[in-house]
Amino acid sequence: MGVPDELPPGSSETDTIVSSSQPTNRSPMDLISEAESLNLRRIATNQSKAQCRPGSAAVPSHDNPPNDDLEDATLDPNSASFSLEKWLRAAVSDASQHGLSTPSGGILFRNLTVSGSGSALQLQPTVGSVLTAPLRFASLLRHRRIEPRRILHGFDGVMKTGELLLVLGRPGAGCSTFLKTVCGETNGLHIDADSVLHYNGVSQQRMMKEFKGEVVYNQEVDKHFPHLTVRQTLEFAAAARTPAHRFQNMSRDEFASYAASVVMAIFGLSHTHNTKVGNDFVRGVSGGERKRVSIAEMALAMTPFAAWDNSSRGLDSATALKFVQALRLSADLAGAAHAVAIYQASQSIYEVFDKVTVLYEGRMIFFGPTGTAKEYFERMGWVCPARQTTGDFLTSITNPLERKARAGMEDVVPKTPKDFEIYWRQSPEYKTLLGEMTEFETQHPTGNDEQASAELRARKENSQSRNSRAASPYILSIPMQIKLNTKRAYQRIWNDMSSTMSTVVGQIVIALITGSVFYDSPNTTAGFQSKGGTLFYAVLLNALTAMSEITSLYSQRPIVEKQASYAFYHPATEAIAGVVSDVPVKFLLAVAFNVIMYFLANLRREPAQFFIYFLMSFTVMFVMSAVFRTMAAVTKNAAQAMGLAGVLMLALVVYTGYVLPVPSMHPWFEWIHYLNPIYYAFEAMIANEFHGRDFDCIAFVPSYADLDGDSFSCSSLGSVAGERMVSGDSYINFNYTYTYSHVWRNFGVLLAFLIGFMAIYFLASELNSSTTSTAEALVFRRGHVPEYMRPGYTRPTDEEKAVTQSDIKPSSPSPTNTDLPLPPQRDIFTWKDISYDIEIKGEPRRLLDDVSGWVKPGTLTALMGVSGAGKTTLLDVLAHRTTMGVITGDMFVNGKGLDASFQRKTGYVQQQDLHLETATVRESLRFSALLRQPASVSIREKHDYVESVIEMLGMGDFAEAVVGTPGEGLNVEQRKLLTIGVELAAKPKLLLFLDEPTSGLDSQSSWAICTFLRKLADSGQAVLCTIHQPSAILFQEFDQLLFLAKGGKTVYFGPIGPNSRTLLDYFESNGARKCDEAENPAEYMIEVVNAEVNDRGTDWFDVWKGSKECQAVKEEIERIHEKKRGTAGAIEETDDGSTKSEFAMPFWFQLYVVTVRVFQQYWRMPEYIISKGALAIVAGLFIGFSFYDAKTSLAGLQTLVFSLFMVCALFAPLVNQIMPLFITQRSLYEVRERPSKAYSWKAFLIANILVEIPYQVLMGILTFVCYYYPVVGSSQGPDREGLVLLFCIQFYVYASTFAHMCIAAMPNAETASPIVILLFSMCLTFCGVMQPPDALPGFWIFMYRVSPFTYWVAGMATTQVHGREVVCGENELSIFDPPTNQTCGQYMERYISVAGGQVLNPSATAGCEYCSLTVADEYLAASQIYWSDRWRNFGLIWVYIGFNIFVATAVYYLFRVKKWNGRRKK
C-alpha cells in the first residue's frame, strides 16, 4: 500500500502534521507520517465512496462523512479543511453507535500485596550432584518447603478511562510483577486475600473468566507467525474481534480489511503490508516494524486495559516516542488505559503520560500525576541535576549511589525503601490519591460483582456473533473461530510453499529409494520377505512423517497462547484448524509416497487392494499425527515431547509385528502391540496383499527331479506336503498369525484411535496452554556461595531478585584505587574514506559513505546516528568483523596498515551478551585472559589481572555465580558487565569497541556503564562506543562524536565540547534551529539530522563535506600518520616476537584450555548427560527384554538380527541429541571468540569431538550390559563378550563423529536433521537386514558395501551366534513322506550333501522332519556374513569414524572459515 499519486481534491499535504521543531507537547498525531496521513485519507475517501454505491445499506450524499454531520467540513476527506484526527474520532463515535465501542478501561487496586515462590539462591546442578542426590534425600526433604517471598507490599492506585500510567523502577523493583498482576497473569504468583483489585467494579476472577481479552499483558518479545504478511496478521486480529454490528454495515471481510488498513496507516506499516512479518530465521520486516505490528495487533484486540512490560527495549528514543504516542492515540480515541514500564524514558516520552508510579524494591513510593512527581521528591529533599530528565531523576531516587540530597537535608530524607513508603503514605499526594480512589469506588462499587459486570456483559453480547455462548469471553462462535483459523492455516501453508514442496520432494525421493530396493518383488515364495519388508517400510514411513509436527507445534505455542489471552479464539479451535488444513497436505504426501512405493515394489496390481492399501496408509498417517500432536500438547517443553516420542517410536517399531512377529513376543511386553496403531495398519496391509492368492514355490525339499505325491514340500512357511503352490493366507497365519477377517476390524480400531487421540489433543491444547513464571534467582556452584547469601547472614535484598541491583552496581572508585592496571596505550587507530557496499536482491547498496576519523588513547568517542544509519556496520567494518560486501578506504595503526594481530589487540563488546551458560563469571574472565593475553604473561599474572577486572567492575558479589539463562542466572545488567569484563580481561592493546553497551539497561545502569567507560579512558584506554540516544548528562561524558546520517554519511566528527557547545555551535552556525537550554543535545541533533536538510535546503552530508571541520579531520589524520611513522621503529623494537601473530597462545595450549572448558560444560549439563544415559539404558533394556533369550530357531536367528537392526535405529536420536549442543557452542565461538582471535577453529572442532568420546564410551558400556545379557546370556566366553562390548562402544563413537560431520557446516540443527535422516535411512536400508545383498537390484549393491551398518551388524551378529546349533521350531520344519521302502535319512542323504541342513527323524519311514540349517553360521552366510570377517569389520568402522572427522574438518573449513572471494578468514 503506497502513497496515492495525487491527493483528494482540496487536500493539503501538511494537514494535521505538527511541526517537528517543537521539542515538547507534541500532538499524538505526530507519529503518523505525511505519507500515511495521505493513505488514511485515501481509505476514508474510499469508504465514503463505498457508502454511496447503489445497493449499499446506507446511501449518504458525497459530503456525508462517517458521523452523518453534513455541516462539518473537517470530516469530509475531500474538503480542504479535512482533519484526520477529527475524522478518526468521528469514526470511533459512529462505531460506538453501532455497538463497536470498547468498554472503558479503569482499574483500582488497594493494599495490593503479592508473593512469589522460588528460592533466592540456587545451586548449579552437575552430573555428580544428580547421581548423588539419593544420598542427600533427607536434606532435600527438609529444604523442600520454601517460604514465599513477598514481592509487592501494599500498593494503592487508580487508573481511569483514557489514562496512561508510566511505571518506573530499577530492574528488580517489582515493575514486571505489578504489570502481570493487574493483568491477571498470576502463574507462580500469589495475591494476598486482603488485596482489592477490580476493573470498574468487576473482580479480577470474573474478568479473567468472562472478559478475558479486556485486560491484556504484553511482553517485550514479539511473537508472530513469521510466514504471514503484515496485512494477513492484522486482518486476522481484526476478524477475530469483529463485532456483530459493524461500522457502516460492512461485511465481516470488509471490516477486517478496513480495520487492518487503518491501523497500518496509523502505525506506519502500509508500505510493509505485503511483506512477511519474519523472525530471527525468516526474512521479514525490521525489528522496529515488527514491534509496531505487535502494537497494531493489540490495538485491533480493542482491549480497554493493557500493560506493556519494557516493550520499547531495543528501540531508539525516537521510535520509543512513536510507540508511546501510539498508545496515547489509542487512549484518546478509544478510551483505553495503558500501564507502561520503560527503563529509559526521555523527557518527551515522560510528558506523554498522565500518571507515574515509582517502585523501590517492591514498595510503591509515589503514584500520581506526572506533573507533580518531580516537585514531590524535590520537596522531600532531593536535588534534580540540570538537564536530567524527570524519568531519570525519579528512578535515581531508588538508587542510594545516584540520588543527591539537598544541602542540610542529608539526615532528614528517607533512606530505606520502607522509609520512602512511610513518607509517601503521610504525604498530601497520597491523601489526594485516596480521595480519587474513593470517588472511583463510588462510581464503580465493588459490593455487587454481578451488577458491575452487567454493562461489560451487555456490550460483549452486543458484539458477539449469533451462536456464541453468553458466558464466553470470545466474540466469535466456535465454528467461526475454526473457519478463521483454518483460513490462516492455509495462508501459512501457501506463504511457505517451499517447505511443503520440499517435504513432498523428500517423500518422493525416499519412495524411489525404498521402492527400488524392493523393486519388482516376484509373485512367488521368493518374494515373501520382500513384500513383508516393503509393507513394513511403507507403514512406518507413512506413520513417522508426523514426528516433525512436535517441533512445529512448539514453535507456534507462544503465539497461540498470546492470541488466546487477547480472546481471539479458543486454543482448541486453532488445533482443529491445524488438523483440517493438514488434510490436503497429508493427502499430497500420501499420494506422492504410496503410489511410487506400491508400483515400484510390484505389490498387488488390483484396484480394490490398492485402494485398501492407500486407505490404511492415509489413516495411519493421521492417527500417528494425532499421537504426536497429543504429545506436544500434554508436555511443557519440546525436549520432553521429543524424548517421549523417541521412546514411543522404538516401542511402536518393535511391536508392529514384523521385526518381532506376534508368536515371538514375550508376555511382559506383548500387551504393547494391542495399543499400537501401526500394528493394526500393518496387519491389514499384509492381509490385503496376501489374501486369496496362491504363490508358486521356487524351492522344494528335496529338489529332486520327477517328484510326486507327498514326497516333497515347499521350503516356505505355510506349505503343504505335495503342493507346488503356497497359500498367502496360510503363510501370513504361520508367520505372523494374521488373518484377512481382521482388515475392516483394524480399520475401525484405527478410527477409534484417531477420534480418541484427537479428542485428547484438542482438550490438552485448551487446558495446557499457559506457561508458568518463576522468580528470578542467581545460581552458584556448590561450595562457592558468597557469604552474604548463606543462611543466617542478614543484608538488604530485593524480593524479586536474588541479589539487589544496588548490591552489584559497579561502585564509584575509592580514593585509594583510582588507577586501573591497564597496559600503557601508545597506538592511534585511524581510518580514511571508508565505504562499504553490499548487494541486496541483485542491486548494490551503499551502507557507509566516505567515513573518516580516529580514536586516540585516553579519549572516549561516541558513535551515533539516526535509526538505520549504519552505526553497528561501521563498528563491524573497523573491527574487521564483516563477512560479505566490498570495503574501500584505508585503516591504519600509527600510520601503517593492519597486520594479522589487529583483531586480537582490540576488544569488541557486542550488543548481544553471548556467554557460555554453564561457566561462572570468574571462569569466563579467566578463559579470555588465558587465551588472549600474550604468552609472555604468566598464568598467575593473568589470574591476578582477572581479579583486578572483577574489582574494577564491582562484580565481586557474583564472581562465582553461573552465567545461566535470563531468569535463572545473571540479569541484564550483570550480563552486560560480564561482556565488558571479558574484553577488558584480554588487555586490548589498541582500543575497545562497544556496540550499544546501554541497550536494555535502566538509566542508572547506563550511567554506571558510561562513567566506567569514562574512567577507562582517563586511565589511557582508547574507546569507541555506539549509543542510541543518551541523556544530556550521559552525553557529556564523551570527548568526541562521530555522527552518521542515513546511508552511512558523516554529518559530524569532532569534539563535543563543554555543555556540548562545540557540537551545537557547528549545527546552529550551519542552518539548524537554536537548541533550547532545557533540551537534550543528543535528541536535538537526531531531530535536526532527521530533517535531512538545513534551513537553506542543503543536505547535512554536503554541509559536512564542505565545512572547515571536515578539512581539519583530514589534515589531523595526515599529521598523526607522519608523526607516528617517525616513532614506529622505536615502538617495534620493544615488542616481543609474538606481537604480530594471529593468536596470542600456541595451538596446544589453546586446545588444552578449550577442551577443559568443554569438559566442564558437559559435567554441568546433567540433563544432557542423563538424557543420553536414559536413552542408552531404557532402549537397551527394552530391546534386550523384547528379544529376550533369542532362540537358535530360524525365527530366533531372524529376530536376533532384527534386534541389531533396532539398536541401529537408536542412531538418529543419538545424533539429534548432539547437534543442538554443538550449534550452541559454535554460535558463541563464531560470533564472539573467533573474531577476537581467542583460539583457532581447529582447537574448537577437536575439543568438541574429543569431549563427546568418554561419554559415548560410557553409553556403549551401558547399552552392552542392558542389551547383550538379556538377548544372548552369559554363556559365551570373555573374548566374544569383549568384542561385542567394543562394537557397542564403537557404535556410539561413530554416532558422535557422524553428528559432527553432518552439523559442522549447517546453519542449524533443523537444517541438518533432514540430511541426517536421509543418510541414516539409506545406511539402515542397505545394511543387508531388510533385503539380503543377493536380493538387491544390481544398481544398489554399491550402497550395501558403502553402508557402515553393513559391517557393524555383520560383526555383532557373527560374534553373538557363531557356532551355535540351530533347532528349528515346529512351524519351520518341512514335513513330507519318503518313497516306499526308504527311510527319511536315506531319502534325504543326497540332498543334504548338496544343500545342507538336517533330518530330525532319519530312521522314520513317514512324516520326515527336515530343518534347513545345522549351525547359525549357515543362516548368516546367506547374507554374506562370516565369522572370519569380524575383526576386519571392527577395523572398517574405525575407518568410517576417521572419515567422519576428516569430512567434519574439511566442510567446516570450506564453508565456515575459508572466504571464497580470494581472502581468508583466519
Curated annotation (Swiss-Prot):
Segments of this protein annotated with the region Disordered: 1-30, 47-76, 441-469, 789-822
Pfam families the UniProt entry points to: ABC2_membrane, ABC2_membrane_7, ABC_tran, ABC_trans_N, PDR_CDR
SMART domains: AAA
UniProt domain ABC transporter: residue ranges: 135-386, 829-1071
GO cellular component, one term: plasma membrane
Keywords: ATP-binding, Cell membrane, Glycoprotein, Membrane, Nucleotide-binding, Repeat, Transmembrane, Transmembrane helix, Transport
Main subcellular location: membrane
Induction or repression: Expression is strongly increased by imazalil. Expression is also strongly increased in the presence of hygromycin and 4-nitroquinoline oxide (4-NQO). Curiously, expression is repressed in the presence of camptothecin, imazalil and itraconazole.
Residues annotated to bind ATP: G865, V866, S867, G868, A869, G870, K871, T872
Gene Ontology molecular function: ABC-type transporter activity; ATP binding; ATP hydrolysis activity
InterPro entries registered for this protein in UniProt: AAA+_ATPase, ABC2_TM, ABC_trans_N, ABC_transporter-like_ATP-bd, ABC_transporter-like_CS, ABCG_dom, ABCG_PDR_1, ABCG_PDR_2
Compartment(s): Cell membrane
Compositional bias per record (Polar residues), positions renumbered to this chain: 11-27, 803-819
Glycosites: N46, N111, N249, N310, N523, N735, N768, N1381
Membrane topology: Multi-pass membrane protein
Family: Belongs to the ABC transporter superfamily. ABCG family. PDR (TC 3.A.1.205) subfamily.
Task performed by this protein: Pleiotropic ABC efflux transporter involved in the basal level of drugs susceptibility, including antibiotics, azole fungicides and plant defense toxins.
Protein name: ABC multidrug transporter atrA
Species assigned in the record: Emericella nidulans (strain FGSC A4 / ATCC 38163 / CBS 112.46 / NRRL 194 / M139)
Lineage, top ranks: Eukaryota, Fungi, Dikarya, Ascomycota, Pezizomycotina
Gene from which this protein is expressed: atrA
